[in-house]
Amino acid sequence: MAYFPHTPQEIREMLNTIGVDSIEELFSEIPEEIRQKAKENFKLSASPSEIDLLEEIKQISKKNIGKDYISFLGGGAYRHYIPSFVKLVSLFPTFYTSYTPYQPEISQGVLQSIFEYQSLICDLTGMEVANASLYEAGSGIAEAALMSVRITGKKEVIVSSGLNPEYISVLKTYLQVQNIDLKILPLDENGETDITALERTISPSTSGVILQNPNFFGVIETKLKEMETLIHKNNALFILSIYPISLGILKPPSEYNVDIVVGEGQSLGIPLGFGGPYLGILATKKEFIRQIPGRIVGETIDLEGERGFVNTLQTREQHIRRAKATSNICTNEALSAISAAVYMALLGKKGIKKIAEVCFSRAHYLKDRLQKKLGIDFIYPNSYFFNEFVIKTPENSKVFLKKLEERKILGGIPLSKFYKEREKEILIAVTERNSIEEIDYYVKSLKEVLKKD
């Protein structure tokens, strides 16, 4: 897209239209102190040469850390290996856009790729239909909650406190402006959703119950079937947030009779990025297809008998009837969805299972080493987990992690970032990118920090 700055004449016309004499007057409501500070912070040299500008950016980028650090960060964004082929296909000029086409049948290549993505998500989750993707998991959770309200006609949503706190924050933002009640369930002593609390809280007024498996603290929910029975007994919808890679070894959501599956697709071949772009997964039962937000690509046969692909059921969408649309999802993450499709097709079921097994085994190897070598205390020692767990620290977790950072280790997420009362707890994640050597170095470094003999 070309960039053409406003001409002096255009600026004058705009100022005249709003009845302002100058740009200075336009911003006069902002205190001079703040304006001056902004000028200092964003001051640029006059028309730098390209080489000077690149050098300046290079110097600024040195403030970032990451490439030379061993990472044990998780909490919804994971450092998985991305095969070169995924990057190659994703950068094809025909795919290199975030847009799904508006015209029902234009861009057959893009439409087929999105159709394959939808099919692969259905294979992974066991669900019947999937959409063409959403922005990320947070908005996906919110859209699923709104789906439950539309389908049931009820305006009360229950969510487990085991759901990623950032997703809960997004959910609150969506629901509060639509006057939908949100109730949050506590966890039990093992870090699982308290089923007794669910029994007390759920009612005929509940539209949907949202759980996450594995949950934010890495704990695997073992009572999903019992909770599913309880949810459907009250004519509510069962919504489950997933970690896609974990489905390589965990049962698919369909086996728990889940109504709507949502999740963060970043682990499926999408690079880590501060702010994205990531990928919101949403899949559901066929009976709810007309309430799905966003695009849906379908397969059809044209007049000449050839297989083709189209945007289907478009009357649900905001560009057809904005006031009655199921959502305002428009420019979705189609490029991220295509990357995920290439990743899943390349690895296949066996490949995803293998990655899940490696994540599982190395995380358990680390926990075992921490327990036996260092006597580390765990927050949920008796719970099952996939590739994340929470440890206790002898001092403030941020101070503790800073000491590991000095040894070029990103040791985990301080839970005090989300929960003030958990200032001595760290969430640790392990993926296939963490070699046994890295794990051993982590244990060795922890020993030094703890000053263990």
Curated annotation (Swiss-Prot):
One of its GO terms (biological process) is glycine decarboxylation via glycine cleavage system. Its EC number is 1.4.4.2. One of its GO terms (molecular function) is glycine dehydrogenase (decarboxylating) activity. It comes from the Bacteria. InterPro entries: GcvPA (IPR023010), GDC-P_N (IPR049315), GDC_P (IPR020581), PyrdxlP-dep_Trfase (IPR015424), PyrdxlP-dep_Trfase_major (IPR015421), PyrdxlP-dep_Trfase_small (IPR015422). Keywords: Oxidoreductase. It holds the Pfam family GDC-P. It catalyses: N(6)-[(R)-lipoyl]-L-lysyl-[glycine-cleavage complex H protein] + glycine + H(+) = N(6)-[(R)-S(8)-aminomethyldihydrolipoyl]-L-lysyl-[glycine-cleavage complex H protein] + CO2. It is an enzyme of class 1 (oxidoreductase). The glycine cleavage system is composed of four proteins: P, T, L and H. In this organism, the P 'protein' is a heterodimer of two subunits. The glycine cleavage system catalyzes the degradation of glycine. The P protein binds the alpha-amino group of glycine through its pyridoxal phosphate cofactor; CO(2) is released and the remaining methylamine moiety is then transferred to the lipoamide cofactor of the H protein. Belongs to the GcvP family. N-terminal subunit subfamily. This is Probable glycine dehydrogenase (decarboxylating) subunit 1. It comes from Dictyoglomus turgidum (strain DSM 6724 / Z-1310).
